[in-house]
Amino acid sequence: MLLCDSCNKGWHIYCLSPPLKHIPLGNWYCLECLNTDEETFGFVPGKCLLLEDFKRIADRAKRKWFGSGTVSRTQIEKKFWEIVEGSGGEVEVMYGNDLDTSVYGSGFPRIGDQRPESVEADIWDEYCGSPWNLNNMPKLKGSMLQAIRHNINGVTVPWLYLGMLFSSFCWHFEDHCFYSVNYLHWGEAKCWYGIPGSAASAFEKVMRKTLPDLFDAQPDLLFQLVTMLSPTVLQENKVPVYTVLQEPGNFVITFPKSFHAGFNFGLNCAEAVNFATADWLPYGGSGAELYRLYRKPSVISHEELLCVVAKGNCCNNEGSIHLKKELLRIYSKEKTWREQLWKSGILRSSPMFVPECADSVGIEEDPTCIICQQFLHLSAIVCNCRPSVFACLEHWKHLCECEPTKLRLEYRYTLAELDMMVQEVEKFGGCKTQETKISQRPSSGTKRSIALNKKEGMQVSQARPADKWLLRASKVLDAAFSSVEYATLLKESEQFLWAGSEMDRVRDVTKSLNKAKIWAEAVSDCLSKVEGEVNDDSMKVHLEFIDELLRVNPVPCFNSGYLKLKDYAEEARKLSEKIDSALSSSPTITQLELLHSEVSRSPISLKKHEILSKKISSAKMLAKRAKRYLTDAKPPGIEMDALFKLNSEMLELHVQLPETEGILDLVKKSESARDKSNKVLTGSLSLENVEELLHEFDSFSINVPELNILRQYHVDTLSWISRFNDVMVDVREGKDQRKLISDLSSLLRDGASLGIQVEGLPLVEVELKKASCREKARTVYTARKSLDFIEQLLSEAVILHIEEEEIFVEISGILSTARCWEERASTILENETQMYELKDLVRMSVNIDAVLPTLQGIENTISSAETWLQKSEPFLSATSSMASSPCSMLELPVLKDLVTQAKLLNVQLQEPRILETLLLNCERWQCDNHQLLQETEDLLDNAKIDDGTHSNILPKIMDLITRVDSARRSGLALGLNFDELPKLRTASLKLGWCCKTITLSSSSPTSELLEDVGKPSLQHIQQHLKEGQTLEILPEEYYLGKRLMELKDTGLEWAKRARKVVTDSGALALEDVFELISEGENLPVHAEQELQSLRARSMLHCICLKPYNSRSMVSCSQCGEWYHTYCLKLHWRPKAYVCSACCPLAETTPQIDPARATEPERPSLNQRRTRMVATDAAVNDLKWKTRKHIKRTTKRSPQVHILPWFFT
C-alpha cells in the first residue's frame, strides 16, 4: 500500500493510473490532492473573460515585463527560458486554450455560417470548401478520421487558442499520435520547438533523467502537458530540437509522435485541429498501447477505427499496406489472448451487441475496461456477479474473484471474420505480403473432420473436442426434438464459435441447432395454445404464423405435434373461405352475426375476423342513424350533405337494411327542393314567386342550402318593407333631418343589398337627397361656408324644387351681401391706401356669415405692415436719440432688409423714408472709414526709423490716431453694429504700439547712457513684444518690429556670453572680461544686473587667482580675503584661519589638531542633498558677510548673481 502524504489514504501501486513498479522516494500525493492543491504546478482554470478584457490583461502583462519600449524576440525568448529555469522570477499569465469553435465560432468560413454582405458568394463558397479550411481537413478523402461519426472537439472540430506574452504549451504529442495542423489568424508570433518522432524515445529518457522525482511519482507526466524543459538541455543530451517561428497566416503541421512545445510572443489567436492519413495507422496503434500502459482513457477506439476503415474500403493501394499491418497486429493479439483464455477455462462466449451505425466510429456504444480504461470493441470479459462491469482480455484476472468457468467472453467478430477482413483489404489493395499469406485460413467449405496431423498447438487441442461435439450434434438432429439436449449442445458450442475458419463447421451446425430449436419450440407453443381453448382473441395464434411454420421444408427436426397443428390450420382456412363468401354477397345483419359467433369459437385467430366485426358494427351504426332520420318526430336540422353521405355509405356497405328505401325517398325530395330553388335564384326574384316556393316546402325537415337562402331573402324583404313604411311617416311629418338622413341612408343601403326587388327604393333615394340638402343649409349658420358652396347649395335646392323654403331664401340674402363686400375689397387692394380703410373692411366682414376670399389678403396686408413697423422700431428709436449703447447695437444687414421690404408694402407710411436716410448715412460712414483703415495699414507697412527720422513719423501717427478715434465715435453714434468698429479699435491700438516701439528703438547712445539713462531694458522690450503678439502683430512683418527684434537679439546674445563667462571658474582672461564689460556698457539696451555679475567675475581670490565659485572656501580672520580649502590642502574648514600674507612668519599651514587630522565621515544622503541645494542657492545671494577690515587695503567681494534667462 502507498499512503498519500496529504490525505493519508492508501492505494495499491498496481491499481494506480498508471500503475507504479515500486514505492517512490520522498513525498507522494494522490491525484485527488494534486487536483485540489492551489499551489501545484501546471495550469489552473481561469475565469470567463470577454476578448476586450483579455486584450487589456495581455497588454498589461507585456508592459510589466518590458515596459512600453520595443523589445526583440530574442530578448523575449531568453527571458522566457530564464523564467522556466527559475532565474527570471515568477510569472502568471492567462491562456485561452481549447475553445470549442462550434460554440465560439471559427476563423474559417463554414457552410452553416451567415455570409457577410461584403463578401461575394463565389469567394465565400470557395473558402468554405477549401481543403486548407481546418473545418474540412479532418474529413478529407484519405483521412482516417472521416470514419468518425460524432464530432470530437479538438480532433475533428477545431479548437481556438487565445494567447498572451509567455503563455505556453508544454512538451507533448497529440492524442493517439495524430497529425495536427495549427493556423495563426492574427497577433504576435508563436515560437515552436519540435522533436522528430524518431527521437521520441531519446527525448523521454532525457526527461526522466533530468526530472527523476517527478516521473517516479507520476509516470504519466508527459500526458499532463505541464512539463517544460529547455531545448538547450535536450541538445546537450544529443536530442535534436528544431525551432519554427509562426507568423500570422502561417500553417504549422506536427507529425505523429513528434513531441512539441512553445510559447507566444504576445497577444494572438490561433486555430488547430487533428487529421490522420493512412501512414498514421502504426503510430495510432502505438498510441493506443501507451494509453493502455498508463491506463488513460482514449479519445476513440483504435480497433473500431481500423474495422470501419477496412469495411468501408476507403484506403488506396499505399494506405492498404499500413491498414493490413495494423489489422494483422490486432488479429494476432486477439487470437493469442482468446486462446489463452480458453486454456484458462473460460469456455462461455457470446456475440456483442452490434450498434445501429456499424459503418462509422462512435464514442458511446462500446464499454471500457475497468482496469486500463480502454474501449472494448473487439472483445471483453464479463461475469454474472457484476454484469455491468467489463475487463479487457489482458486484465481479466482483475475483474472479480469468481472462477474462470463463470466468466464469459463477449466478442464482436470471430477470428474467421477478422481474418476475412484482412483478406478483403489485401484484395482491395492489390498486393500481398508475407504476413497476409501466413494469416490465411482454410475456407468454411472443408469437411466436418479436421485434419489433425496438419495442426499444432491450440488448434489441435480445440479440434478434438470440436469433432466430438459435431458427432453428438448430428445424432441429436436425427433424433426427436429434446429441448434439454439442444440447450446443452448450444451452450457447449460457445467455446468454439469465436475461433477461426477451422471452426466454420461448428458454427454451421450451431446455426442449424438454433434454427431447429426455435422451429420446434414454436410448433409446440402453437399446439398448446390451440388445444388449450383460449377465449381471449389477443392470446390466440394467428393463422399466418402457423402457415409460416408449416411452410418450412424440409422440417429442421422431428416434432410429433406437427401433423396435429396442420389439421387445425386446415379447419381455420375453411372458416376463412366462408367469411369471404359471406362478404362478397349482400347478407343481412343477422346472417353476419351468426358467422361472427362461429369465428369467435375457433381456437385460431383469423385476420378476416376483424373485418367481419367492423362490417357488423358499421351496419348497426348506419341503421341507427337512418331510423333517426325516418322517425315520425322528424327532428329539424338534418343537413343535406349528411343525408347524401348516409345514403352512399349504406349502398357501399353491401348489407341488407330495412331503412334503405326510406332514406332514398328523402334524398329524392331534397334534390327536388334544390333544383326548384336554383331555378328561382337564377331568374328575376319577386316576392310572390319566393312565397309560393316556400309554401310548397314548408314542412320539409332537410336543410337544403338553396332553400334556406330563399327563406332568408323572404325574411329580410318583409323586414325592409316594415321599416320603409315607418320612415315615410317621419318624412311626411318633417321630423329631425339629421335622424331622417341616417334612417334613409340605412334604408337605401339595405334595400340595395336585398335579394328580392322592392318598389319603394327610388322614393327613398329622392327623399334622402332632399333631407341632405336641408341639413347642408343648416350648417351655413353653424359654420361659415365658402361662396361657391352656398351657390352650389342653392342650385341643388332648385333642382329638388325646395328653393322657396324659408331657409334657402335667407341663404340667398347672405350671398348677395358677400358679393358687394368682395367688390369693394378688390378695389382697395388694387391701389395703396391708408391703414384705417383696411381695418374698416375687416370690421365689416364680421357681420357676414360666409367665407370671404379677399379677407385673407386684407388681413395679410395689415399684418405685414404692423410686423414691418415692429421690426423698424429699434432703428427709428436710434434715429431719434442719436445714441446707442454697445449692448443694443443694431445690424446693418437688417436695416437694408427693412428698407427693401418697405417697398413691397401696399400701405401708405412715413417710416420707410426715415430708414432710407439712416441707411445712406451708414454707407457714407463705411466708405470714409475704409480709406482711413487703408491709410493706417500703409503707414505701418512703410514706416522706417533712422537717426532723426522718428521726429517726422511720430506726428503723423498721432494725427492718424486722433482721426481713427473720431471715426470710431461717429460710428458708435449711428447706433449700428458695424464690422469696421473692431477694426478701428485694433488700428488705434496698433498705432499706439508703434509709437511706443519708436520710443524704445530710437534711443541713441549719448553721454547720458553712461549712467544708463534713456536705455530700454530687455524686460521692457520683451513685454512690449508680448503686447504686440496680443494685438496679433508679427514683428517680422513691419519694419519697426524688425528693428525692435534686432535690439532684443543683440541684448540676449550679449547676456548669454556674460552668463557663460560668470560661470567659467576663471577660464577667460581678465582682459577679455573687461572687454566684455565695456561691450555691455555700450549696448543700446539696459543690462545692469549682468554688468554687476561680470564686475564681480573680474574680482580674483585665493592663491590660485580664480574668481568666486561654489566650492568650499575659508576667510582670513585678519584681512578678510577668501581662500579655497582645497588650495590650502585643508580637509575641513577651521573655525579661525590666518593667511600667509597676514602672518608671513608662520608656517604655510596652520597647526592642526592630530585628533582631527582625519577626514570626517561621509554624510547621509539627505544631508548631502540639503548641502547641494544650499550650495546652488548660495550662488544667487551669497554675500561676503564674514570679511573684516584689516590694515592692508582690500576690497569687499560684491554680491554675485546668476544671469537671468530671457528666453520666452
Curated annotation (Swiss-Prot):
Domain of life: Eukaryota
Binding site for Zn(2+) 5: C1116, C1119, C1139, C1142
Cofactor(s) the record lists: Fe(2+)
Intervals of motif Nuclear localization signal: 613-620
Gene3D superfamilies tied to this protein: Cupin, Zinc/RING finger domain, C3HC4 (zinc finger)
Residues of the JmjC domain: 126-292
EC number(s) reported in the record: 1.14.11.67
Binding site for Zn(2+) 2: C369, C372, C392, H395
Tissue: Expressed in inflorescences, roots, seedlings and siliques, and, at low levels, in leaves and stems.
Chain residues that bind Fe cation: H172, E174, H260
GO CC term (a single one): nucleus
Residue positions binding Zn(2+) 1: C4, C7, C30, C33
Effect of gene knockout: Increased dehydration stress tolerance associated with abscisic acid (ABA) hypersensitivity during stomatal closure regulation. Ectopic increase in genome-wide H3K4me1, H3K4me2 and H3K4me3 levels and activation of several dehydration stress-responsive genes, including OST1. The double mutants jmj17-1 jmj14-1 and jmj17-1 jmj16-1 have an early flowering phenotype (especially in long day conditions). The triple mutant jmj17-1 jmj14-1 jmj16-1 flowers even earlier.
Details of cofactor binding: Binds 1 Fe(2+) ion per subunit.
Catalytically driven reaction(s): N(6),N(6),N(6)-trimethyl-L-lysyl(4)-[histone H3] + 2-oxoglutarate + O2 = N(6),N(6)-dimethyl-L-lysyl(4)-[histone H3] + formaldehyde + succinate + CO2; N(6),N(6)-dimethyl-L-lysyl(4)-[histone H3] + 2-oxoglutarate + O2 = N(6)-methyl-L-lysyl(4)-[histone H3] + formaldehyde + succinate + CO2; N(6)-methyl-L-lysyl(4)-[histone H3] + 2-oxoglutarate + O2 = L-lysyl(4)-[histone H3] + formaldehyde + succinate + CO2; N(6),N(6),N(6)-trimethyl-L-lysyl(4)-[histone H3] + 3 2-oxoglutarate + 3 O2 = L-lysyl(4)-[histone H3] + 3 formaldehyde + 3 succinate + 3 CO2
Chain intervals annotated as zinc finger (C5HC2): 369-421
Protein family according to the UniProt entry: Belongs to the JARID1 histone demethylase family.
Stored PANTHER family: LYSINE-SPECIFIC DEMETHYLASE (PTHR10694), LYSINE-SPECIFIC DEMETHYLASE JMJ17 (PTHR10694:SF133)
Function: Functions as a histone H3 'Lys-4' (H3K4me) demethylase involved in the regulation of gene expression. Active on H3K4me1, H3K4me2 and H3K4me3. Repressor of the abscisic acid (ABA) signaling pathway, especially during stomatal closure regulation. Negative regulator of responses to dehydration stress by binding directly to the chromatin of SRK2E/OST1 and demethylating H3K4me3 to regulates its expression. Together with JMJ14 and JMJ16, required for plant growth and development.
Record protein name field: Lysine-specific demethylase JMJ17
